[in-house]
Amino acid sequence: MSATESCAKNVQYRVDHLLSAVENELQAGSEKGDPTEKELKVSLEERDLWTRFKELTNEMIVTKNGRRMFPVLKVSMSGLDPNAMYTVLLDFVAADNHRWKYVNGEWVPGGKPEPQAPSCVYIHPDSPNFGAHWMKDPVSFSKVKLTNKMNGGGQIMLNSLHKYEPRIHIVRVGGTQRMITSHSFPETQFIAVTAYQNEEITALKIKHNPFAKAFLDAKERNDYKDILDEGIDSQHSNFSQLGTWLIPNGGSLCSPNPHTQFGAPLSLSSPHGCERYSSLRNHRSAPYPSPYTHRNNSPNNLADNSSACLSMLQSHDNWSTLQMPAHTGMLPMSHSTGTPPPSSQYPSLWSVSNSAITPVSQSGGITNGISSQYLLGSTPHYSSLSHAVPSPSTGSPLYEHGAQTEIAENQYDVTAHSRLSSTWTPVAPPSV
């Protein structure tokens, strides 16, 4: 075998599979063909779905940039000459002589129609093609776009609020004989709109259109967000009676309480703390992460325990009484000198009378004083006193019953404490 014959054989092998593919393509729709074209038939796909839209008066969106149709117009063809070439076209004609309007949940005629726009014809992108190709699979017009502006580019211009009916035309090409057939389907009539008017049409399109699932998911997310917002608003209303919250460095959560001045503090060191503290006051996120643990406890626990919380700054500065709580975690103090009991947490009590402050000390001094976070914001620090000034024997309600000698033994005696005035006068330590 010569080199020329070998090369020709290789070329034949290379094109055989190509010719076979073409023949298979032609044979795919040939069984539906009719060279005489006497039994040409075009049938609508998804007729039941179109009928459901027809019963509700179908609507199609038209936009400046063009919007695709749904349901998509699809037809099946039979009776074409498998070996002849055809071009398939689509146009839209007015279904009536009315301009429509949507009133009280239904479409009613609303006047005379506008002049018809110049006729626009959409040519199927597979055109021209053999009859076998058109008959092999349903012909879909999924790429046609409806617009209300004259843009060109193969888009179909329609007048809004007018009813239209699509028509499909089949034209035989490639020969001297031209044959044109037209087919229309009443189920495909629709009213062109810039926005859906009938909510049932919207729901039906969302249900059956796979490309509308994103719109459905977005709507569900918005509904869920609204539910969350309503829940947060309700939670805010439940906490409105608790007033302003104050968290000291010690980790106690306190709220104003009209019944008692000092109660047991609500500790946040335990994981069973306040639920969502950062979202109680507003919806804005904090610039720094909250150090408190978020739990799913019911917010009612805070409301129920509000009477036991520490009451701090109220709307007025007049403190009528000051009672020390019987709580071992309240206002921890450190002792520098003296020999008080190691469990004592209140080494110094201040008695205010006639604008004078009389320090009563068991240990001889205060190391750190009472933090200004628990008292008035302008309260000065009394870092240290060199001496304990003896209190007068009379005139001070703190020592009316001789409670001075009992403090060391009863560190939580709250019955003999004095009342504090809103006016505090700084006093210097007495000289020796």
Swiss-Prot record:
Gene Ontology MF terms: DNA-binding transcription factor activity, RNA polymerase II-specific; RNA polymerase II cis-regulatory region sequence-specific DNA binding; RNA polymerase II-specific DNA-binding transcription factor binding
GO CC annotations on file: chromatin; nucleus
Biased composition (Polar residues): 293-306
Main localization category: nucleus
Residue ranges of the annotated DNA-binding region, renumbered to this chain: 49-217
Summary of the tissues where the protein is detected: Expressed in presumptive mesodermal cells around the blastopore, and then in the notochord.
Subcellular location per the Swiss-Prot or TrEMBL entry: Nucleus
Sequence segments annotated as region (Disordered): 274-306
Pfam families named among the record's database cross-references: T-box (PF00907)
UniProt entry keywords in alphabetical sequence: Activator, Developmental protein, DNA-binding, Nucleus, Transcription, Transcription regulation
GO biological process: cell fate specification; cellular response to fibroblast growth factor stimulus; determination of left/right symmetry; embryonic axis specification; heart morphogenesis; mesoderm formation; positive regulation of DNA-templated transcription; positive regulation of transcription by RNA polymerase II
SUPFAM superfamilies from the UniProt entry: p53-like transcription factors
InterPro entries, alphabetized: p53-like_TF_DNA-bd_sf, T-box_DNA-bd, T-box_sf, TF_Brachyury, TF_T-box, TF_T-box_CS
Function: Involved in the transcriptional regulation of genes required for mesoderm formation and differentiation. Binds to the palindromic T site 5'-TTCACACCTAGGTGTGAA-3' DNA sequence. Causes dorsal mesodermal differentiation of animal cap ectoderm when co-expressed with wnt8 and noggin. None of these molecules causes dorsal mesoderm formation when expressed alone. Establishes the left/right axis at early gastrula stage by directly up-regulating mesodermal expression of zic3.
Subunit-structure text: When not bound to DNA, exists as a monomer. Binds DNA as a dimer.
Protein name in the entry: T-box transcription factor T
